[in-house]
């Protein structure tokens, strides 16, 4: 049996912690009754070893073993730097 490593892309919304960032993942879901597509946001705590991310950056993350109570994702790469 092969395990697939889950990877996601999202936007950095906070980088105030040391070696950690908060990434918001947006997805669209269909409303069960009305059928309208709605945006839903999930916030994930991500391990950033080198503190290389800033707010607004688009990043790629992957799932890993639990690193703390809330962190079980790690940074793969910065896809797009935010223009500030």
Curated annotation (Swiss-Prot):
It holds the Pfam family Ribosomal_S17. One of its GO terms (cellular component) is cytosolic small ribosomal subunit. It comes from Buchnera aphidicola subsp. Acyrthosiphon kondoi (Acyrthosiphon kondoi symbiotic bacterium). It comes from the Bacteria. Belongs to the universal ribosomal protein uS17 family. One of the primary rRNA binding proteins, it binds specifically to the 5'-end of 16S ribosomal RNA. Part of the 30S ribosomal subunit. GO terms for biological process: translation. This is Small ribosomal subunit protein uS17. The gene is rpsQ. GO terms for molecular function: rRNA binding; structural constituent of ribosome.
């Amino acid at each position: 049996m092969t395990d697939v490593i889950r990877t996601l892309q999202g936007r950095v919304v906070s980088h105030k912690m040391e070696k950690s960032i908060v990434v918001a993942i947006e997805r669209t879901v269909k409303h069960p009754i009305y059928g309208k597509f709605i945006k839903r946001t999930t916030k994930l705590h991500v391990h950033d070893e080198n503190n290389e991310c800033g707010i607004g950056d688009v990043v790629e993350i992957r799932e890993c073993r639990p690193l703390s109570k809330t962190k079980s994702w790690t940074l793969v790469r910065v896809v797009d730097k935010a223009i500030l």
